[in-house]
C-alpha cells in the first residue's frame, strides 16, 4: 500500500494540481484542442507525463463546458521485462474505457538500428503509425500526447542544432494525410512540475528500457543545456517559450515565410522623423546658408556638410 501523504505534501499536491489544471485548460482553450462531442484517444505510455495528462483531462472532463469522451490507449511494444499487468490494473481502478494494443516494434527497432545508435526516431515513427491507424478504427477525433513545454523547447533546439530548421512540436497538429488531429494538452506545463506531481500522486511509472535509459543522446545534451540556463538565469526558459509564440517573419531571414523579394518603398509615404514634426516650417534642405533665415532647433536640424554635384 502507498504511504499516506503528509499535510505538507497534500498542500503541495493541491497547489500543483491547480497550476497544472490551469495550464492545461489554457492550452486547450488557446488552441481549441477539445470541442463538444470529441472522442479523445489519450495515449498512455506508462511514463509520468502521460499519467499526469490522463489524470488532469479526467478532472477537467467533469468541469468542462463541453462534453467529450476519453479513451485511454497503450501500445505494448514487446520490450523485454515490460510489466504487462501494471497499466490494466491502474486503468481498471479508474473505471474508464481503455485498449491495450500489442505490436512487436521492439524487434524491428533492434534489427534495423545498430547497437549504440539512437533508437528513438524509428521507435516513435512505428508507434505513431500504429496509434494513428487505431484512432481511425475507434472513431477518435483527437489523439492526445503527453509532450510538455520542455519537450517543445528541446525539440526546437534539436532541430536548430542538428537539422538546420526552426521547428518544434506544435500544441495542435493535423497529420500529413489529414486523417488525425494530434493535441498536446501539457504544452504549457513544466517537466519539473509533472515530475513532482507524478511522485505525489504515486503513479505506477513504467521505465522505458529501450531508449529512455540510453546515455549521450542529443536530446539529453540539449536538456542539460536548458537546465543549466534555468539555474543560472531564472525565467529564461519561460522567455524562450514566449518568444516561440511571438514570431515575426518579416524580421527574420526565411524567404518561404515572408516575401522579401517583392518589398518596394512607397514613394507617397509621409515623411517621418524629427524633420517631419508639425511645428517645424518647411525649408530647403540644400539651403546650407539658411538664406531664408528659418530658426530651427539645432538638435532637429539636418547638418549638410557637403553637397555632391555630378
Swiss-Prot record:
Ranges spanned by the short sequence motif PP-loop motif, renumbered to the chain: 45-50
Keyword tRNA processing: yes
Cofactor: Mg(2+); [4Fe-4S] cluster
A Pfam family the protein falls into: ATP_bind_3
EC identifiers of the protein: 2.8.1.-
GO molecular function: 4 iron, 4 sulfur cluster binding; ATP binding; magnesium ion binding; sulfurtransferase activity; tRNA binding
Keyword flag Cytoplasm: yes
Gene3D superfamilies xrefs: HUPs (3.40.50.620)
Taxonomy, superkingdom: Bacteria
Reactions mediated catalytically: cytidine(32) in tRNA + S-sulfanyl-L-cysteinyl-[cysteine desulfurase] + AH2 + ATP = 2-thiocytidine(32) in tRNA + L-cysteinyl-[cysteine desulfurase] + A + AMP + diphosphate + H(+)
Binding site for [4Fe-4S] cluster: 120, 123, 211
Gene Ontology cellular component list: cytoplasm
Pathway linked to the protein: tRNA modification
Listed SUPFAM superfamilies: Adenine nucleotide alpha hydrolases-like
Alphabetized PANTHER family for the sequence: AMINOTRAN_5 DOMAIN-CONTAINING PROTEIN (PTHR43686:SF1), SULFURTRANSFERASE-RELATED (PTHR43686)
HAMAP family per record: TtcA
Quaternary data: Homodimer.
Similarity remark: Belongs to the TtcA family.
Protein's name in the database: tRNA-cytidine(32) 2-sulfurtransferase
Amino acid at each position: 500500500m502507498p504511504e499516506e501523504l503528509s499535510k505538507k505534501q497534500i498542500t503541495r499536491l493541491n497547489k500543483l494540481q491547480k497550476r497544472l489544471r490551469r495550464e492545461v485548460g489554457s492550452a486547450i482553450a488557446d488552441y481549441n484542442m477539445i470541442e463538444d462531442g470529441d472522442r479523445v484517444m489519450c495515449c498512455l505510455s506508462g511514463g509520468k507525463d502521460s499519467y499526469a495528462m490522463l489524470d488532469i483531462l479526467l478532472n477537467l472532463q467533469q468541469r468542462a463546458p463541453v462534453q467529450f469522451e476519453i479513451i485511454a490507449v497503450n501500445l505494448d511494444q514487446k520490450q523485454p521485462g515490460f510489466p504487462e499487468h501494471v497499466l490494466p490494473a491502474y486503468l481498471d481502478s479508474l473505471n474508464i474505457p481503455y485498449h491495450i494494443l500489442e505490436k512487436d516494434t521492439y524487434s524491428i527497432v533492434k534489427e534495423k538500428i545498430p547497437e549504440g545508435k539512437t533508437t528513438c526516431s524509428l521507435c516513435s515513427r512505428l508507434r505513431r503509425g500504429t496509434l494513428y491507424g487505431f484512432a481511425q478504427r475507434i472513431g477518435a477525433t483527437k489523439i492526445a500526447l503527453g509532450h510538455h513545454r520542455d519537450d517543445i523547447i528541446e525539440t526546437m533546439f534539436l532541430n536548430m542544432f542538428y537539422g538546420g530548421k526552426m521547428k518544434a512540436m506544435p500544441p495542435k497538429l493535423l497529420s500529413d494525410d489529414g486523417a488525425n488531429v494530434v493535441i498536446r494538452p501539457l504544452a504549457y506545463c513544466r517537466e519539473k512540475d509533472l515530475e513532482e506531481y507524478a511522485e505525489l500522486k504515486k503513479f505506477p511509472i513504467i521505465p522505458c528500457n529501450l531508449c529512455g535509459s540510453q546515455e549521450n543522446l542529443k536530446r539529453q545534451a540539449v536538456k542539460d543545456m536548458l537546465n543549466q540556463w534555468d539555474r543560472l538565469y531564472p525565467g529564461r526558459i519561460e522567455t524562450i517559450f514566449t518568444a516561440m509564440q511571438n514570431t515575426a517573419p518579416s524580421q527574420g531571414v526565411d524567404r518561404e515565410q515572408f516575401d522579401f523579394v517583392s518589398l518596394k518603398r512607397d514613394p507617397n509615404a509621409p515623411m517621418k522623423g524629427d524633420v517631419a514634426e508639425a511645428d517645424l516650417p518647411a525649408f530647403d534642405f540644400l539651403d546650407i546658408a539658411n538664406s531664408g533665415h528659418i530658426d530651427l532647433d539645432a538638435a532637429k536640424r539636418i547638418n549638410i556638410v557637403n553637397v555632391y554635384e555630378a
